[in-house]
Amino acid sequence: MSKFILKVLWLDENVALAVDQVVGNGSSPLTSYFFWPRNDAWENLKTELEKKTWIDEVERISILNKATEVINYWQEEGRRRPLTEAKARFPEVVFTGTA
């Protein structure tokens, strides 16, 4: 995922996912945030990434696999754990939030 950054907004009742594209030394938003479980964040992210036909399928699958891991962790145990633990578990993901 070196060309892309998975960003996660970690909240008490929801988790939200977005993707940025790495541009030079910074990044540029590629998608908006999609919320789980309020909406189907994974499906929304998949649909949005598929619209960007210039993203290689291998990269798209890698992003979606990491999104799946983050959502599963949040559902199973993460929402009851501090944000610092999520950051340690997924060092390649950019986290922000209040939980």
Curated annotation (Swiss-Prot):
One Pfam family from the record: PSRP-3_Ycf65
Biological-process GO terms, alphabetical: translation
Residue ranges the record marks as coiled coil: none
Keywords attached to this entry: Ribonucleoprotein, Ribosomal protein
GO terms, molecular function: structural constituent of ribosome
CC per GO annotation: ribonucleoprotein complex; ribosome
InterPro entries per record: PSRP-3/Ycf65_sf, Ribosomal_PSRP3/Ycf65
Family: Belongs to the chloroplast-specific ribosomal protein cS23 family.
PANTHER family, alphabetized: 30S RIBOSOMAL PROTEIN 3, CHLOROPLASTIC (PTHR35108), OS04G0461100 PROTEIN (PTHR35108:SF1)
Role summary: Probably a ribosomal protein or a ribosome-associated protein.
Complexes and interactors: Part of the 30S ribosomal subunit.
Name of the protein described by the UniProt record: Probable small ribosomal subunit protein cS23
Organism: Acaryochloris marina (strain MBIC 11017)
Top-level taxonomy: Bacteria, Bacillati, Cyanobacteriota, Cyanophyceae, Acaryochloridales
